[in-house]
Structure formats: structure tokens, C-alpha cells
UniProtKB/Swiss-Prot annotation:
Compartment list: Cytoplasm
GO molecular function term, any single one: flavin adenine dinucleotide binding
Species whose genome carries this gene: Zymomonas mobilis subsp. mobilis (strain ATCC 31821 / ZM4 / CP4)
Protein's recorded name: tRNA uridine 5-carboxymethylaminomethyl modification enzyme MnmG
Binding site for FAD: 17-22
Needed cofactors: FAD
Reported function: NAD-binding protein involved in the addition of a carboxymethylaminomethyl (cmnm) group at the wobble position (U34) of certain tRNAs, forming tRNA-cmnm(5)s(2)U34.
Subunit organization: Homodimer. Heterotetramer of two MnmE and two MnmG subunits.
Length: 621
């Protein structure tokens, strides 16, 4: 509900900001029984997708599934809004596959708003959070711009890109946290006055195109996946009509137009000081850094079923409007395309995440938790996952109990938080599978098994999810029990498996052999056909990955004992398998002489250290 009058009641938790982080924080805190208020400048913009109309992707899809394991909002809203499903990295193993959906913006926002309005213990309040009321170094209330105080002793800050924010398009610069919306100035000033470590980052968005003016017949179509996977582990499934996306490319003419306009770009004129996201660079950055390429992919993504708007993924820009129009019209299929809204950049304040605990609580200001872009991250999924953790942590603090543990072994959420609070950021942080050294066990398909038991114990699941998790975990245990049955190689050969191993193994252990398929198991245990596809597929993947998990754990255990191992001065980090471009850049610049020095390079991940150790051992043998 919307609560408007003067506030006289006390809230256990006040969440500031109605973006993806704020929505998850407010929802989980309320599910856990905390009396929660969600403060937003405009209730109609709650859950808005500010940039690309998509959820998931490589690494990001894992986060969404982990949010689902805690009964979060994002996965169900994604399925309600999904107009295009695509499993990324499908040709690779399930550990690094990335579920991604294209969303109808309005349907997504509607799903989030409906879920929040129906959530018990949650009040939605329209207003601008201006400052904290403090007493002896502790927050006692959140003061709104119109003078209303919201009494509370626990706050979750999810200000997104609104904190002391500026918008840029060419030579134009104006105040705003998002197009058409005001920034948060008062709160930014108070955070500065509290002497918190702040910095500035930048992000951007491309122009929005009129799809009726695109020559679709000349473009490569990309249909939705036909198999029926979804983002949420339970629910109504795919409910919206599925439509195709299309693909085009920039060309040399496009690049020449962009180069000619760079002197009017705020990215290169010095107007923008904050660093932008490495893994979602502007088209200006692409042309400057990869000028030798003859073209860059551009995915034309519909913004919804009832709108002609198209999101051109791959050409984020803050170039002047005339340059944007010219370079877009130089692209195949877009020669006559009209721009409905020009691209722009936003620069905003963030808090150095090293000032946070692993519960995302400010060390210097107890009971104030931070989530999302205020912590130096980029992306809806990263924000939502942090919001989930901040909401859980705040609710646990209110209840006087220890919070759950998200660590590098049990979740991508734990990897992200560990990276943030220990290493900090020099650019907007994006989740990648390469950041997780235990990624072989952190598959998107086993998030419920990994995390939902803990979520249930903390009272974070609604009634439907509680029932689903109880049944799913029981079904999995029963299925796993069946696969303990022993079978000889002769048994396996009798059902068509091409194996030569002479020993007898459990059926689960036989899954280590690529020649053994689900059909072979069902021939030996017909009862397997009675189990859900999700459970059987998950356990089969467990079996497939078992030997690799053993090897992974052994390598990581050995890592601790190799601090003094020298690293060749001429080591080519670009040739190391599993090392991201970001890590290649950091290590190539630092040139650490040994593994101990490598571990102290800012931003290094345990996964990167493991990859370097494995490579170094090979080249020194």
C-alpha cells in the first residue's frame, strides 16, 4: 500500500530506493517478519528497468537462480515478463551456462509492483529521503524532503545511480539520476559529512529506436529457445508470447562518424570523471580500444509486446544527438531508423565497498546497510542479489540473530560480496563465472539444493516456496538413493552403454563416464521416469562433474602452500586459460615475482590465482 500521512509509527527497517536492490531488500525483510518501509520517489517507477530490458546472462543468470532459491522477486517477474529466452554458452558445460531472458519492460515492472503491494509487513511510501536523524552516532529516523520522519533504527540504502548524479549527452549536462527523474542530493551531502569513503562511477545507455522504421528483412533473426526452461524454479512457466530478436553490426562508416564526433563526447572531453563498466563499454570506448575491428555486434531487442521501442544492445553512448542519429543510420537495416530517445551517460557517487562488512553493513555506521550501485556494482542482477543479502542481514539484526553465511564455496552471491568488501572496485563490478574458483559446483541448476534449505531455516520463504522446497529436496534425496544401486560393466553394456571399465560402480559413479546417458539409467531403474526432469538432470550433472570437483578442490588446497613459487618475468598472462581480460590487464601491469605477490594485486580473485598457479606449474616443469 502507499502510506502518505505524517509518520507516527516505528519501522523495523526503512529501505531507501525502489530499484532492483531495494525491491529485494524490502521483500525479504518483510517475508522474515520485519516491519518494513520502502521509500521511493515515484511508486510508478518501482522495479523499472532503467537500461536494457533483460535479466540474466553469464554469471548474472547464476545470481538470479540464487535469488530464486531465497524466494526473491526477480525470477518470477522475469518469467512473467519474458518475451525471449536464451541459454548462453549452451555448447559448454552446465556450470558456465547462463540463462537469460528478454523482458517486456511494463510487464516486469507490473509483476514487481504487484508482488510488493501484496507482501505482508511492507509499506510503500512516496517521498525523497533527504537525510538521517542521528543520536549518539546511531540512526533514529529517515527524514523525507517534505519533513516527514520515518522512525527506525535500521536502514538499507539502495540509491542506484541517483546519488549526487549528473546526466550527459554531448556538450549537454544536467542534474538527474535517470532520464526525467531528479537525483538524490541531500542524502549524498550527509554521507559526505559523515566522512564515508566516496567515489564516482559512470554508466550509460543507448538510444531507443522506433522498430517500425527498421528494415527487419535485412537482419539476422535470433529466435527464442524452444525448450521450456524458466528463471524461477516453480510457477506458471512461460506465460507471454515469444518473439525474436535480431542482429546487425557496425561498420567502418559507423566508426568514422563516431571518431569524428569524439571531441564532443563527455567521455573524452574530461566532463565525466567516473570510470565506466569494463564489460558494458560505450561504443566510443569500443572504437578507441578496438579500432582495428571491422565491426561490432548490435543486438536489436524489443522492449515489449505493445510498444515499437527497440533497445540496440551494444551501442551505449553519450555522443551528441546529431552524431547518434548519423552513426545509427550508417548501420545495416537502420538506414531510415528514427530515434525515440537519445542515449546518455550518468555519473554518480558510490561508497567504497571496503567500508562494508560481509553482511553489507557500514562499519562506521551500524545498522545502515548498502546494496546495489551504491556499492560500486553494475547490473540489475548484482543489485538484486545484494539487496537480498542486505534485507536478510537487516532483518536478522532486528531479530537479534546471526545472519546466514554467503561465501565463495556456496554461492556466486558470496563470491561477489567477498570481492567487493575485500578488494573494493576501481570500475563498476560485474559478475562473471571466471570470478568463482568453485564454479564447477555453483551451477545455475542447483541453486535450490545449495541455498533453499538455509533460506527455509531463516524464515525467508513464502508458503508456496516452502512447500516447493520441501518436496524438491525430498524428491532429490529419493532419486539420489536410487542411484546408489551398484551395476557392473556387463549391466551397463546390456542396456547399450559403450563402457569397457571392468569394475562395478554405483549408477551415480557411472555418470563419470560420458558414454553413460540418462536413457541407460532409466533402462536399469525404470522408476527414474517418475521424477521431475529438473531433479534428474541436476543429479546427472552432479555425477558428471564429480571427478572435476575433486580435482578443483585439490588444486585449491595446494594453492595455499605455494606462496613462494616464482612467476616468470616474461609470463604471458593472456595465454592462461580461465583468466578474464580484467585479470590479464591487472597482472600484466603488476608483473608479480611470485604467488604471494600475485595474491596482493588489487582486485585479484582466488579463481585467478588458481588459474595462474596451474599454468605456472606447467611452464616450470
Amino acid at each position: 500500500m502507499i502510506f502518505i500521512p505524517v509518520m507516527k509509527e516505528f519501522f523495523d527497517i526503512v529501505v531507501i530506493g525502489g530499484g532492483h536492490a531495494g525491491c529485494e531488500a524490502a521483500a525479504v525483510a518483510a517475508r522474515m517478519g520485519a516491519k518494513t518501509a520502502l521509500v521511493t520517489m515515484d511508486s510508478e517507477q518501482i522495479g523499472a528497468m532503467s537500461c536494457n530490458p533483460a535479466i540474466g546472462g553469464l554469471g548474472k543468470g547464476h545470481l538470479v537462480r540464487e535469488i530464486d532459491a531465497w524466494d526473491g522477486l526477480m525470477p518470477h517477474a522475469a518469467d512473467y515478463a519474458a518475451i525471449h529466452y536464451r541459454m548462453l554458452n549452451r555448447s559448454k558445460g552446465s556450470a558456465v551456462q547462463g540463462p537469460r531472458i528478454q523482458a517486456d519492460r511494463n510487464r516486469y515492472k507490473k509483476a514487481i509492483q504487484t508482488a510488493l503491494k501484496e507482501q505482508a509487513h511492507l509499506t510503500i511510501i512516496e517521498g525523497m529521503a533527504e537525510s538521517f536523524q542521528m543520536d549518539k552516532g546511531k540512526v533514529k529516523a529517515v527524514l523525507l524532503a517534505d519533513g516527514r520522519p520515518l522512525k527506525t533504527e535500521s536502514v538499507v540504502l539502495t540509491t542506484g545511480t541517483f546519488l549526487d548524479a549528473w546526466l550527459f549527452c554531448g556538450e549537454k549536462k544536467w542534474r538527474g539520476g535517470r532520464i526525467g527523474e531528479q537525483p538524490s542530493i541531500g542524502l549524498a551531502e550527509q554521507l559526505k559529512a559523515l566522512d564515508l569513503p566516496l567515489g564516482r562511477l559512470k554508466t550509460g545507455t543507448p538510444a531507443r529506436l522506433d522498430g517500425r522504421t527498421i528494415d527487419w528483412a535485412r537482419l539476422q533473426r535470433q529466435p527464442s529457445d524452444e525448450d521450456a526452461w524458466t528463471m524461477a524454479s516453480y510457477g506458471a512457466g512461460r506465460v507471454a508470447p515469444q518473439i525474436a530478436c535480431s542482429l546487425t553490426r557496425s561498420n567502418q562508416k559507423t566508426h568514422d562518424i563516431i571518431r569524428a564526433g569524439l571531441d564532443r563526447s563527455p567521455l573524452f572531453s574530461g566532463a565525466i570523471e567516473g570510470r565506466g563498466p569494463r564489460y558494458c563499454p560505450s561504443i566510443e570506448d569500443k572504437i578507441m580500444k578496438f579500432g582495428d575491428r571491422d565491426g561490432h555486434q548490435i543486438f536489436l531487442e524489443p522492449e515489449g509486446l505493445d510498444t515499437p521501442l527497440i533497445y540496440p544492445n551494444g551501442i551505449s553512448t553519450s555522443l551528441p544527438e546529431d552524431v547518434q542519429q548519423a552513426f545509427i543510420n550508417s548501420i545495416e537495416g537502420l538506414e531510415n531508423t528514427k530515434i525515440v530517445q537519445f542515449g546518455y551517460a550518468v555519473e554518480y557517487e558510490f561508497i567504497d565497498p571496503r567500508s562494508l562488512t560481509h553482511q553489507l553493513e557500514l562499519k562506521a555506521l551500524k545498522s545502515v546497510f548498502c546494496a546495489g550501485q551504491i556499492n560500486g556494482t553494475t547490473g540489475y542482477e548484482e543489485a538484486a542479489a545484494q539487496g537480498l543479502v542486505a534485507g536478510i542481514s537487516a532483518a536478522c539484526a532486528v531479530a537479534g540473530k546471526a545472519p546466514p553465511v554467503f561465501d565463495r564455496r556456496n554461492s556466486y552471491i558470496g563470491v561477489m560480496i567477498d570481492d567487493l568488501v575485500l578488494q573494493g572496485v576501481t570500475e563498476p563490478y560485474r559478475m562473471l563465472t571466471a570470478r568463482a574458483e568453485y564454479r564447477l559446483g555453483l551451477r545455475a541448476d542447483n541453486a535450490v539444493t545449495r541455498l533453499s534449505g538455509q533460506a527455509k531455516a531463516f524464515g525467508a520463504l513464502g508458503a508456496e516456496m516452502t512447500d516447493f522446497v520441501t518436496k524438491r529436496l525430498a524428491e532429490r534425496e529419493k532419486c539420489q538413493k536410487l542411484l546408489e544401486k551398484a551395476a557392473s560393466s556387463r549391466d551397463m553394456q546390456a542396456v547399450g552403454a559403450n563402457v569397457t571399465e571392468g569394475a562395478s560402480h554405483s549408477l551415480f559413479e557411472w555418470l563419470r563416464f560420458p558414454a553413460v546417458t540418462r536413457q541407460h539409467l532409466e533402462a536399469l531403474i525404470p522408476e527414474l521416469t517418475e521424477f521431475s526432469d529438473a531433479v534428474v538432470s541436476e543429479i546427472i550433472d552432479d555425477g558428471r562433474y564429480a571427478p572435476y570437483l575433486e580435482r578443483q578442490d585439490a588444486e585449491l588446497a595446494r594453492l595455499a602452500g605455494h606462496d613462494n613459487m616464482p612467476l616468470p618475468a616474461e609470463l604471458d598472462y593472456a595465454t592462461i586459460a580461465g583468466l578474464s581480460n580484467e585479470m590479464v590487464e591487472k597482472f600484466s601491469a603488476a608483473r608479480p615475482p611470485d604467488m604471494a605477490s600475485a595474491s596482493r594485486v588489487r582486485g585479484v580473485t582466488p579463481a585467478a590465482l588458481a588459474a595462474i598457479l596451474i599454468h605456472a606449474k606447467k611452464v616450470t616443469l
